[in-house]
């Protein structure tokens, strides 16, 4: 493939990707806020539009609420910290030989 054909192909692919991105953003635009919601059907339609718009933008936030797994991990961490503080509470854990002293 020649250099000019390669450049033309790269430009075409770039333009296609840009056009596809613009098309997706335009189709997912927020529904306009209507102050003329008079009936229950209009309000229901507006809420459905908002739900479809924000439905794909909402993210699940893991770890925000404490569950059984988080409680178990927290308890285990507390137990580990307590065991460390008991072992290092000013007592010698092992005796040093005279050869080990610098």
Curated annotation (Swiss-Prot):
Transmembrane segments: none annotated. GO terms for cellular component: extracellular region. Keywords: Amidation, Cleavage on pair of basic residues, Digestion, Hormone, Neuropeptide, Secreted, Signal. Residues 1-29 form the signal peptide. It is found in: Secreted. The modification Phenylalanine amide is found at residue 62. Residues 30-32, 66-102 form a propeptide. GO terms for biological process: digestion; larval feeding behavior; larval foraging behavior; neuropeptide signaling pathway; regulation of response to food; social behavior. GO terms for molecular function: neuropeptide hormone activity. An integral part of the sensory system that mediates food signaling, providing the neural basis for the regulation of food response; coordinates larval foraging and social behavior changes during development. May have a hormonal role in females. Belongs to the NPY family. This is Neuropeptide F. The lineage of its organism: Eukaryota, Metazoa, Ecdysozoa, Arthropoda, Hexapoda. The gene is npf.
């Amino acid at each position: 493939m020649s250099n000019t054909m390669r450049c033309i192909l790269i430009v075409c692919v770039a333009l296609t990707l840009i056009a596809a991105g613009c098309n997706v953003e335009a189709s997912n635009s927020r529904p306009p806020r209507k102050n003329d919601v008079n009936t229950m059907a209009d309000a229901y339609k507006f809420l459905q539009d908002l739900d479809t718009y924000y439905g794909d933008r909402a993210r699940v936030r893991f770890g925000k609420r404490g569950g059984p797994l988080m409680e178990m991990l927290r308890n285990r961490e507390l137990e580990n910290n307590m065991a460390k503080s008991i072992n290092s509470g000013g007592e010698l854990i092992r005796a040093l030989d005279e050869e080990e002293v610098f």
